[in-house]
């Protein structure tokens, strides 16, 4: 069967930049799905996207579906013919329905019954006939929240459609898609090459558009932007901040990217750089530049969609646009400094945290008391922790945070520095919200760690205390994410504390506000322990490793983490699979018949294999016990791995359930001793493979 290259392009008005990549990928996926469902084989489907177009190139696609046979089932052979071999009424009805004669019948075996059938030859449809509907269906299935149409069109799309290209090699496939007749004419850059571009062949698409100042390949356009931005940054010994989302959005805004470096007045560098970066990235789509120390430089890079003969005008235009925004940030920053942070508590007293849990000032005072209590665990200075907690939410009343909500905490740090607070206090104000997401950095200061813990614990315990724990997809206070943050703060700072101890400390701040302390404690502890799985799955830890540790229900997150790491390492040992299987066998035996109380009686060991296992246990136990006491679980399991050979020999040569009651009891005690050594770390019997 012959193969062809197909080009499809949908031209339209400017597509939403934040959706362009998603639309491209969805169009590709839906088209692949349609081709597969139609039984059309192909080598690849390449997808392209630019501000005014979505396109696909289908490589080496079949010219048509393969011819097939469709089977229509009739009556059983026994019921199809009478004693004389003539068709019965049942068979005649079947033939009449299919419009066939006896000589066109076949038979097939349906289980034990032979049946009559008609095998109808079905000629495969051509690519030309199938493709228009495949593409239209793909367009209809795109994830578009709100569709629109132009006045002359009956069909809807995310933006009004202007033209459609559908080429099979060098031939136009006759089709009407999105109310537009397909052709071989596309259009170049709106300003540099607005005239029509006739495509002679599907393979000419990318090159023809590049001549018309359009880079249709999204990744190529993006790489060009990255190269240009890096070059401009290097010229001033700086590094560009290039967030992935911003890069995607800028790539979606231009057909012919031209990066230009502009400047702003150095006086604005006195403003918190986070505010300047936010306004330049979010509002202007600029790439900001920083030096080797991470300090903002008085430059920014804009990406133009025009290759201008005089780029100075474009640069000056952008500098003129950004100046008022930077001035606004400067104004807010200076205005806020007229009111010290500590004096803002009155405004916090009028800001509701949660109707039943009080105002933000109520929360601040609870956090302060909790932070003092936590200081003995985190090693923070109690006075610093208390002061930082009382100042922590004050910047929420500032004009800078009002304009840039993402600066909460960060603004507080700047104001605290200006007011002369020490580093522990000032840095803690910004660190209180860390970690913000999975993989985010943690606070660097002990005070920051303390406030971050106190804030999260206060919210979690309070919300559970009023019966508003997360349910299903509802988690308005982001407690699931917050819980993982609590676990990380404990584990990565190596805080030796149990979850219940922390919850109890947080409960003390609520007094009578929380009516049922026992239920709240139990629910909050269970919730935090239930977040281990999400935390470790993000790190790639297997579920059975978690199950092995959870079987012991460790109370301390730090202890839990050490056990997880130990079991993870244990799984890499060559003895692991055999020892896991042996432990499972031991667990099953002891589940059916528990070991009698008492120690193993050496005189009752009669088989060489059980004597050898006992000797190994006696030798390894005094080595392992100090490791367990020191919580060096990785080393403990590594030592226990040496028991593989004597355990295997034991099960190969010893009958545990002996007829002699004393021998059986002794062997059960031996297995219990073995089991207890392993379960001092984790239940490795649940490990798979």
Curated annotation (Swiss-Prot):
It is found in: Cytoplasm. Keywords: Aminoacyl-tRNA synthetase, ATP-binding, Cytoplasm, Ligase, Nucleotide-binding, Protein biosynthesis. It is an enzyme of class 6 (ligase). GO terms for cellular component: cytosol. Its main location: cytoplasm. PROSITE patterns: AA_TRNA_LIGASE_II_GLYAB. Its EC number is 6.1.1.14. One of its GO terms (biological process) is glycyl-tRNA aminoacylation. It comes from the Bacteria. GO terms for molecular function: arginine-tRNA ligase activity; ATP binding; glycine-tRNA ligase activity. It catalyses: tRNA(Gly) + glycine + ATP = glycyl-tRNA(Gly) + AMP + diphosphate. Belongs to the class-II aminoacyl-tRNA synthetase family. Tetramer of two alpha and two beta subunits. HAMAP family: Gly_tRNA_synth_beta. PANTHER family: GLYCINE--TRNA LIGASE, CHLOROPLASTIC_MITOCHONDRIAL 2 (PTHR30075:SF2), GLYCYL-TRNA SYNTHETASE (PTHR30075). This is Glycine--tRNA ligase beta subunit. It comes from Acinetobacter baumannii (strain ATCC 17978 / DSM 105126 / CIP 53.77 / LMG 1025 / NCDC KC755 / 5377).
């Amino acid at each position: 069967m012959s193969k062809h290259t197909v080009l499809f392009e949908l031209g339209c008005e400017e597509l939403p930049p934040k959706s362009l990549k998603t639309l491209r990928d969805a169009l590709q996926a839906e088209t692949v799905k349609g081709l597969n469902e139609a039984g059309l084989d192909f080598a690849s489907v390449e997808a392209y996207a630019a501000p005014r177009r979505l396109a696909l190139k289908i490589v080496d696609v079949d010219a048509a579906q393969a011819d097939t046979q469709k089977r229509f089932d009739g009556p059983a052979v026994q019921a199809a013919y009478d004693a004389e071999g003539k068709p019965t009424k049942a068979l005649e009805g079947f033939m009449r329905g299919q419009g066939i004669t006896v000589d066109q019948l076949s038979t097939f075996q349906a289980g034990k019954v032979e049946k009559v059938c008609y095998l109808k030859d079905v000629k495969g449809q051509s690519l030309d006939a199938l493709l228009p509907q495949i593409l239209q269906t793909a367009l209809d299935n795109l994830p578009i929240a709100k569709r629109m149409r132009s006045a002359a069109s009956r069909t809807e799309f995310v933006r009004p459609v202007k033209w459609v290209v559908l080429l099979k090699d060098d031939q136009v496939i006759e089709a009407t898609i999105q109310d537009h007749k397909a052709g071989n004419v596309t259009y170049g850059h709106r300003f540099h090459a607005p005239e029509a571009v006739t495509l002679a062949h599907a393979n000419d698409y990318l090159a023809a558009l590049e001549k018309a100042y359009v880079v249709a390949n999204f990744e190529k356009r993006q790489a060009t932007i990255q190269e240009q931005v890096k070059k401009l940054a290097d010229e001033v010994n700086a590094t560009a901040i290039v967030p992935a989302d911003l890069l995607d959005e800028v790539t979606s805004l231009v057909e012919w990217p031209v990066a230009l470096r502009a400047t702003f007045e150095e006086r604005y560098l006195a403003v918190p750089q986070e505010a300047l970066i936010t306004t330049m990235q979010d509002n202007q789509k600029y790439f900001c530049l920083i030096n080797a120390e991470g300090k903002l430089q008085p430059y920014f890079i804009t990406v133009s969609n025009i290759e201008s003969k005089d780029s100075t005008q474009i640069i000056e235009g952008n500098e003129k646009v950004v100046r008022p925004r930077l001035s606004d940030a400067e104004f807010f920053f200076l205005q806020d400094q007229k009111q010290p942070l500590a004096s803002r508590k009155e405004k916090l007293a009028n800001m509701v945290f949660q109707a039943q849990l009080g105002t933000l000032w109520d929360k601040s005072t609870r956090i302060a008391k909790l932070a003092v209590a936590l200081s003995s665990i985190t090693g923070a200075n109690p006075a610093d922790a208390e002061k930082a907690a009382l100042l922590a939410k004050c910047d929420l009343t500032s004009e800078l945070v009002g304009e840039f909500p993402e600066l909460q905490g960060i603004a507080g740090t700047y104001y605290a520095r200006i007011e002369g607070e020490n580093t522990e206090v000032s840095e803690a104000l910004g660190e209180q919200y860390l970690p913000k997401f999975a993989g985010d950095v943690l606070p660097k200061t002990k005070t920051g760690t303390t406030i971050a813990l106190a804030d999260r614990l206060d919210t979690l315990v309070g919300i559970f205390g009023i019966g508003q724990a997360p349910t299903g997809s509802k988690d308005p206070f982001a407690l699931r994410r917050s819980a993982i943050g609590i676990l990380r703060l404990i584990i990565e700072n190596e805080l030796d504390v149990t979850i219940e101890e922390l919850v109890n400390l947080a409960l003390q701040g609520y007094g009578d506000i929380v009516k049922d302390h026992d239920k709240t404690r139990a629910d909050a502890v269970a919730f935090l322990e239930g977040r281990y799985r999400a935390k470790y799955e993000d790190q790639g830890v297997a579920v059975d490793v978690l199950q092995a540790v959870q079987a012991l229900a460790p109370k301390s997150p730090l202890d839990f983490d050490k056990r997880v790491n130990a079991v993870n390492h244990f799984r890499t040992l060559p003895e692991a699979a055999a020892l896991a299987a042996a432990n499972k066998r031991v667990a099953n035996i002891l589940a059916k018949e528990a070991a009698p109380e008492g120690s193993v009686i050496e005189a009752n060991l009669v088989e060489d294999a059980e004597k050898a296992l006992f000797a190994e246990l006696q030798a390894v136990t005094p080595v392992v016990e100090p490791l367990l006491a020191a919580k060096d679980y990785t080393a403990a399991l590594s030592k226990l791995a040496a028991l593989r050979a004597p355990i295997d020999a034991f099960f190969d040569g010893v009958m545990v359930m002996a007829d002699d009651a004393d021998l059986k009891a002794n062997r059960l005690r031996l297995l219990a001793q073995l089991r207890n050594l392993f379960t001092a770390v984790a239940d490795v019997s649940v490990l798979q493979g």
